[in-house]
Amino acid sequence: MPRALLSVSDKSGLIAFARGLADRGFELVSTGGTAKALESAGLPVVAISDVTGFPEMMDGRVKTLHPKVHGGILARREHVADLDAAAAHGITLIDLVVVNLYPFVKAAANPATPFDALVEEIDIGGPSMVRAAAKNFAGVLVVVSPADYDTVLTQLDRPDGPSREFRFELARKAFAHTGAYDTAIASELDAVTYHDEKFVRGTTQGYPASITLGLRKRGDLRYGENPHQHAAWYAEESPVGLGAAQRLQGKELSYTNLLDLDAALRIVLEFGEPAAAFIKHTNPCGAAIGSRASDAYVRAREADPLSAFGAVVGLNRPIDLEAAKAIVSTKIDCVIAPSVDPEARAILAAKSQMRVVITDIEQLEQLKTRDVRSVLGAVLVQDGDRVVEAATPWPSNDLRVVTKRQPTTLEWNAMRFAWRLCAHVKSNTVIFTNVSQTLAIGAGQMSRVDAVNVARMKAGNDSLRGSVAASDAFFPFRDGLDAVADAGATAVVQPGGSMKDAEVIAAADEHGLAMVFTGRRHFRH
């Protein structure tokens, strides 16, 4: 009788799979909660303690670390000496190992999980069994994902049993599974410090001496930025982020869709108010806040209706009926939001080619972002850039009014809005806004004067009189500030820090502008 060992944290599909194994003549050996679940379903189960002759002990820390378990997994079926050793020591062969690991990643994703509790989610016996079975894939099937249960049963029904190729594919998945698991543990522990005689999570500054990225393939992409470039996308084991987003309708997401969705989310996450961002080539062409999602959407679209055509759009509120009506009135490529109301689904379905994606915005708020980029022969890693001032009422002690004229309340609110946006536009950038809507965006220019001129060109016949301007970095000379004033802005927010700050401040005073220094630069390359 073939023997299967089952020990899983994720019990989805477990009972049906175990019943399928039992129907095919397998003896079921199991541990702890898995055994209880199988017994409750009426399946015959051999307890792991009956196999080892030792009880499960130390709160389940020691269950499967025993020669009668690992010998049964590692014995090579084609080696007579291995089989003789197993027989001499009363070791029964194990033909199938079904294991998925303690939910460390889920526990680590919750900042409130205490360090001691997190340590208890580090699986020891599970990875050992998985690696042993994967090493001996020629004789043992190893299953780490419920998604493979049906395929395993189908393979078992083959006249000559599971193919060697299939066995190897399961082994490859198993090693990737344990590798990603160990990477998640190492990454989490890298952010732990010892302080006041206790371990504290998420407090380490800087980066470790080595980094291993544990990523799982989500799928192949049709192509990269251009048709001649092959592409795929991968995601961390984290339950949040674009890697966990759900596509409700439309074509498969493309490489550029994913880049633009990321850009859209980064912007709308800056706002507590209903917000919308229209993205083209990772730059916003329009962004706005409003009283509700539909209001924010329409205002963002009207900021640059020409560029809005074919854009990717992000919302930080559910798509309701009114928002859906506004969305289908525009030709856009993709929209992402926290959810879609049922009555809105039918409206959106009329644009069947439009991609509609949902993701949990609240969980994304807690996501610690790190930007990883490849350069020739190396990889660069940095903390993600969020405008932390977004949560602070303006004015605040972190901000410095450097001009003779103080900003009005309306200008303060408009600058706060503009500052949250300019961090997400390619440098050099100068943007013009009112209190709730972009008016003109000068993005990705080689000089700050050019950025202002591009913004003025984008504004066209629409006046920028009475607007505020935000610059992602300091004005190196007064010419950029003169251009801002000539465009019609009445207030400017910028980091400051130029050797020519005094000249720039003098220019602002000459024009009667109010100007605020934040002391923080927001380059985006």
Model-predicted regions and their roles:
Residues 1-6, 99, 181-183, 192-525:
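ATP-dependent carboxylate/acyl-activation modules
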Residues 128-129, 136-152:
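Mobile "lid/hinge" segments at catalytic clefts and subdomain interfaces of large enzymes
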Residues 28, 45, 140-142, 356, ...:
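Hydrophobic beta-strand scaffold residues
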Residues 77-127, 131-134, 401, 406-409:
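Active-site/ligand-binding-proximal alpha/beta "capping" segment
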Residues 1-51:
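N-terminal glycine-/serine-/threonine-rich phosphate-binding loop
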Residues 147, 151-207:
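Non-catalytic interaction/clamp surfaces of large macromolecular machines
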Residues 22, 39, 123, 134, ...:
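Anion (oxyanion) recognition and catalysis
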Residues 33-104, 196:
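Glycine-rich nucleotide/cofactor/substrate-binding loop typically near the N-terminus or early
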